[in-house]
Amino acid sequence: MEPQYARLVKSAALAATALASILLLIKIVAWYHTGSVSLLAALVDSLVDIAASLTNLLVVRYSLQPADEEHTFGHGKAESLAALAQSMFISGSALFLFLTGFQHLYSPETLRDPGVGIAVTVVALFSTLLLVTYQRWVVRKTRSQAVRADMLHYQSDVMMNGAILIALALSWYGFQRADALFALAIGVYILYSALRMGHEAVQSLLDRALPDDERQAIIDVISSWPGVKGAHDLRTRQSGPTRFIQLHLEMDDALPLMQAHLLAEQVEQALLHRFPGADVLIHQDPCSVVPEGRQGRWEL
């Protein structure tokens, strides 16, 4: 486990938890003063944010533990479980928004002091935007699925705060149902984000292969190595920060065992240089045991 990965992932989880806690307190005050259903939706979403971010923080700490006798491949899959749990949290908040939005659509209420709600929403919008910017940078550096799930969650918050701002402004000018309509629209977007996040988490738990560009990069590395005649049965997956790469290398039949071993070691080191922290397993095949139609090919 790279120290930078652990540091960045932990800092992103802590930042999200701290921001969600602060915004929750601010939104409680704003909702009390305005009675806005959109702000109530934002308040509930902040409660979900705290639960999700705390879950994320605990799971990230667990996933960063090194492999042990009972978990020989490490604990990285915990990140996918965290993302799946987050999708459930977010789906619950979306359903709450639908119920509350429909209720206020048919029984609209006049907002009290919408100026307070607008001020609070502006603060929430810009602070969440800063958090998402930091999370996106962490995801680019670490490819952490847990942080990516959290980022998608807070991206929906940015959209929600923008919609709330418009709804409060319209309500201020007499469009009483705008508050409820925007709450319903926000609910649709949040539910979509939750389903997308859940799909990604399930795919990871099912050991989906690495992206095509990364698999092609693996082939590019080994095909440029002298002495390697071909490769097949490439299998890849990712668990937390660790990529798992397995493949069969095709070598000349007359190559001595020690030379074949050294060649495989060199290819492994080249792959580790391209994908730091990866777990690489290479099987050496004499060309003669490979079916004729597959010899000398570089198969993804």
From Swiss-Prot:
It is found in: Cell inner membrane. The chain crosses the membrane at residues 12-32, 40-60, 82-102, 114-134, 155-175, 178-198. GO terms for molecular function: cadmium ion transmembrane transporter activity; ferrous iron transmembrane transporter activity; metal ion binding; zinc efflux antiporter activity. One of its GO terms (biological process) is intracellular zinc ion homeostasis. Its main location: membrane. Gene3D superfamilies: Cation efflux protein transmembrane domain (1.20.1510.10), Cation efflux protein, cytoplasmic domain (3.30.70.1350). Zn(2+) binds at residues 45, 49, 153, 157. Belongs to the cation diffusion facilitator (CDF) transporter (TC 2.A.4) family. FieF subfamily. This is Cation-efflux pump FieF.
